Structure formats: structure tokens, C-alpha cells
Amino acid sequence: MTLPPAYVDELNLLNREVTTKQPTDILRFCADYFNERLAKREEADDDGPRSKPLGGGFREPGFGSSSRSTDGSLFRSSFADTSSEGPGSASSEPAAPFTRRTSVSAESIAPGAFAGAASGVASNNLSAEQLESLYKSVSHNFLFGNLDEEACRSVLQSLQEKKCDSGEKIITQGDEGDYFYIVESGAVEFIKDGVKVNSSGPGSSFGELALMYNAPRAATVVATQPCVLWSLDRVTFRKILLDGTHQRRSMYDGFLKEVPILSDLGSYERNKLADALTSQVVEPGTAVITEGEAGDAFYLVESGEAEVTKKGESGVVATLKQGDYFGEVALLNDLPRQATVTAKTKLKVATLGKDGFQRLLGPVLDHLKENDPTK
């Protein structure tokens, strides 16, 4: 049997990359390589007619992806096949041994395929008070806790209002799940196999796993008072997060190329580093790190300015701007912080934890040590 020429060409290209880069994690390298190839193809497709239907790429969250988030990954932990619909954790009962697993599935969505999708989603007209209340409701939810400000705003603007009368079924046990709900007012109860297992009111949410998989509902949810709910469907949620993940990786890749100390990193190393970074916004006058404290993170300045001060030295000893870095000394030498860094303007930094610092910055650790100000 003759192999397809396109397949042979792809393998030859991959072999060339592997020979050149000599990666230690071959599986991750191949996954990142094909992700990048697919992303470039999607960008090229945006300039002309698509030759394939929307969503025909690899399965979300990514080819060869692990349980950790790329966007930080989308999801940090593994879950049961059925959703625990709300605080009642209706699926928390131990499953009978050797029972057949309930299958779940999710749409195949290629990163970048929905570029600008968030702007195309119908926007609601939430008041400032409603936005604040809804933000508090979702900020502690495991699916939303790692969203950056822009992605969270897109999610909130995509919520659709749903009003329910007392006694109305909102979801039914066993039905396919496709919506997540936040309770703005009223009360609901959770019923599993005909038995009430819990209830909740304003500020609570339920149906999270519907945003990940079209899994069967684990419980029935009934309004016990007239309710105002805000709902989000799975496809919209995944569009927002996947588009955000793709844009975030592209943004960090461009940013990391401009950081002088990281100039020796190849695209493979930059992609791994970009996936591990998290953004943090610091208000003016707030200390990012404080002299004498233990260090657990490395920082890169994305935007804004910060001032460096040291005990025993008068005034500002240095001003940090976009592309500058700090916090490496404590991680290189297991020392307390050697200076205090305070935001001069609104500051946005990319942070990398100690484990990631040592694991992902191997190629540039020698440069960091050479520039170690404590020597």
C-alpha cells in the first residue's frame, strides 16, 4: 500500500524539526509542532474560503494536551462522567462496582477558528450591580477561576436571562446537558432519583459540566420560588475560551521574542513557557514582591512600570519596563527577596512559579546566573 504523499511530506518535516531541536519530551514536542501547524493553517484559511467545515480540526483542548490548562489549560482536573448539578453534589454517591461508564463527548473545535467570536456573541445589557454580582458568582467556580479579565467579561456579556416560575423544571436528570446556570434571585432544589438532595439560592450556580461535555444531567433542578437565572451554553463558552487561549499563546509568543534574556529560546521552548505563564494586574503603589520575604515566582513585565527599592539605599534603585524581569535571584539561590518591587503605574506582569522556572528556563539559567546581582 502506498502512503499518501501529504502524509510523507508531514513526516519528513517533523523528522527535520526533531533532528534539529533534539527535544527531550518527544510526545509534547510533536503535539506542539502539530498544534502550531494547524494554527498556521487556520490563519491561512481566514484569508480565503475554507476547504473544510467549521470545527473540523483536532479535538479541544488540543492535540496531545494534558490535564493542565493551556490557557492555562482549560480544565485542571478530571471529572466524573456525570455532572454534579449544583451544591448538592448529586453525583457524589459511590458508583456501583463494575457498572458501565456513561459516555460523554464534546464538539471538535480548532483554536483560532473562532477569532473574534466573542465580539459576535449577543451581548446582554447588564447593570454594573448585576455584573459585579455575577462576577462574584463565577469567580470561585472551578471553570472560571483561571479566566483573565477579558475572557471573564466576554463570558458575562454572553449570559442570557431566563425566568422561571415556582415549580418549573429547569433541567431534568438524564437529559443531555448543554447549559450552565447562575441563580440571580429565587431558589432551586436538586432532586436525584426522586429524592431531594440539596437546595440553593442567589449567587449559586449549577450545570458546570455541561460547558465541558454534553454529559447527561446527574440531577433534576426545580425552581421552588420564582427565579431569575443567567444561562451560558457550551458552544459559546468553548468559543470564548478557545479563542482566548489561542490569542493568549500568540500574544505571549510575540512578547517572549522581545525579552532579551529569552532570545535563545526556540519556538518549542517559547510555547511551553507561554502555556505556563499566568497574568497578574497590579495597581499603582502596590508591592509585587517585598524584600526579605520568601520567593516563589519569577516575573516578566508585560506593560506598565515598576520601581525597585532596597533597604539601606536611598530612593529608587531601578525602574522596570516592558520586557524587564525580576524575582529570579530568590529562585536561583533559594534566598529571600533581595529588593522590593512596587508598581509605579498600572502594571501587568507574567508570572512563572518556582517549579516552572527551573523546568522551563533551563536554556537561559546560565545567563540569569551570570547577571545575578548578588554575586
Curated annotation (Swiss-Prot):
Residues 64-82 have a biased composition (Polar residues). Keywords: cAMP, cAMP-binding, Nucleotide-binding, Phosphoprotein, Repeat. One of its GO terms (biological process) is cellular response to glucose starvation. Residues 83-97 have a biased composition (Low complexity). The modification Phosphoserine is found at S103. One of its GO terms (molecular function) is cAMP binding. Signal peptide: none annotated. Residues 41-50 have a biased composition (Basic and acidic residues). Residues 28-142 are annotated as: Dimerization and phosphorylation. The keyword Nucleotide-binding applies. The keyword Phosphoprotein applies. Pfam families: cNMP_binding, RIIa. InterPro entries: cAMP-dep_PK_reg_su-like, cAMP_dep_PK_reg_su, cAMP_dep_PK_reg_su_I/II_a/b, cNMP-bd_CS, cNMP-bd_dom, cNMP-bd_dom_sf, RmlC-like_jellyroll. This is cAMP-dependent protein kinase regulatory subunit.
